[in-house]
UniProtKB/Swiss-Prot annotation:
HAMAP family in the record: AceK
Taxonomic lineage: Bacteria, Pseudomonadati, Pseudomonadota, Gammaproteobacteria, Alteromonadales
E.C. no: 2.7.11.5, 3.1.3.-
Keyword hit for ATP-binding: yes
Catalytic residue list: 373
The entry's keywords: ATP-binding, Cytoplasm, Glyoxylate bypass, Hydrolase, Kinase, Nucleotide-binding, Protein phosphatase, Serine/threonine-protein kinase, Transferase, Tricarboxylic acid cycle
UniProt keyword annotation of Kinase present: yes
The name this protein goes by in its record: Isocitrate dehydrogenase kinase/phosphatase
InterPro entries linked to this entry: AceK_kinase (IPR046855), AceK_regulatory (IPR046854), Isocitrate_DH_AceK (IPR010452)
Domain of life: Bacteria
Function description: Bifunctional enzyme which can phosphorylate or dephosphorylate isocitrate dehydrogenase (IDH) on a specific serine residue. This is a regulatory mechanism which enables bacteria to bypass the Krebs cycle via the glyoxylate shunt in response to the source of carbon. When bacteria are grown on glucose, IDH is fully active and unphosphorylated, but when grown on acetate or ethanol, the activity of IDH declines drastically concomitant with its phosphorylation.
Amino acid sequence: MKDELALTIANTIINGFERHFAIFTEITQSARNRFQQCQWNEIHRSARARTNFYDERVKETFNDIKEDFNISSLDDALWQRVKAVYSDLLINHKQPELAETFYNSVFCHLFERKYYHNDYIYVESTAHRLDDKTQPEIYTSYQPKELGLKQTICDIMNSHRTVIPFEDLDRDVDALINTFRRKAHKTRVKLEDLKFDILNFTFYRNKGAYLIGRVLSPAGETPFIIAVLNNEKGGLYIDALLTSSESMAVVFGFARAYFFVDCEHPYALVNFLQGLMPHKTKADLYSAIGFHKQGKTQFYRDFLNHLDSSDDQFELAAGIKGMVMSVFTLPSYPYVFKIIKDKFSPSKNITKKDVKGKYRLVKLHDRVGRMADTMEYSEVAFPKSRFNDELLAELQKVAPSIIRYEGEGEEALIIIEHLYIERRMVPLNLYLMDALKNKAQQKIDDALFGYGQAIKQLISADIFPGDMLLKNFGVTRHGRVIFYDYDEIAYMNEINFRVKPKAVTEEQLYAAEPWYSVMPGDMFPEELATFALANPSYLKAFKIHHEDLLTAAYWQQCQQDVANGIYKDVFPYPDKYRFCNLSFGSIKR
């Protein structure tokens, strides 16, 4: 009887997953038509909807099980059997790792944290069984010796193009070949020694389409991305070629929106991509291709493995303490853990619910490469012995309502009810202080250029950052400036950008408080110079490229552009890589 019940429950869960994956695939496939028809707003709407689908299907499946099987408590033997049966259902499945994560999500909705171990859920994945099977064909190989280099590349591009033709494929392929020769030294071999491996599907995101592959030669492997854009006049053109793991990693960065990529075998795809970008984790790559829940699962497995192989202690993160969040980190692991405080500083007129809403907004919005993606977790257990006394005291002081303890001695755990995890960066204020101390003017100039660019790209994507103090931005290992303090973000239409009234009397000039009326939502751009850029050397470097950010007129124009549906192009690669900016025969449009 229990075997039959276990099979029925397992089938209910797998059917829920299949519903989810079918809907996910349908909306992913729509990106191709959206790209062809230049429906950029629809692409953003689809991205937001797709992110929500997973939780909706989990809740549906959870409700089905609760109602159909009257589940109120865990039957140990039954649920071990359910997991065993479910594992059998995944033996020949195309997405076993995703289906395991879906199972975990449903189970965790049904039962308490004390049951979250490998007897009942997939703490350890069984998807590694795929490594022993014949790998699915997710890429096509091309050998230029047969048709010549130019014709081979033309064939590659045409095999991926949509119903829209290239505006001048001959010109673009010449630019590709020139760029390969200049930048990819390992491709400078005889044609008979070259081979291209090209993934069989196009990666879509925002206004771009990306072809991804590698060139193999006796000199080694060269990964690459070809960026294709729509000229919005009925033609496609190649905009850039990236030929290094580092530049590709930025395209797949944690501050970018998720790709739309129609692939039935994500396990094989992630393995291929990791071969091209070894510094990217599987968690990074699953998230980048749209499976953010799988990214969370993979991250947590990696984190548990790291805890087992390390012995350093968690500690408070470097930088100025936040008024809303408390942040801690593990020095040997490149992430930070953020919890919402029970009480905020008086100047913060928001609630916990508001803060969670802001983080959700960022998850659903186009992050334009300037807002860090976060992973949200509930009921997370840490070994208490790994927390230093200062951190334990701080957590107990600022967030006692979400902290509890289980077990004793070496087995003691600290359970955090709710937290966010994101990539660790160097706070911009500390980065600049270090550069100033070491008289590294170029680093100061680059960082403040990036700071201004981050603000401009955020507001052009309809995100007002709110608190723009330097401490709320971080610098990545690639040198990019990223915003990561979300509790005051707003849409542009919610803000009133004003010119600060000029003081006309001595009393007004030296007033401790504003002598003019200030309403909620008012923002005075010129105050950036006073509050965020008080150091004269910072302000000087900032003004070289971004003096316009100190004027209300600039912000008002951006606000009007957003209201009119005008969004500036933000490319996930430097302008210097764009073919229109390269020295060889400048491509004009």
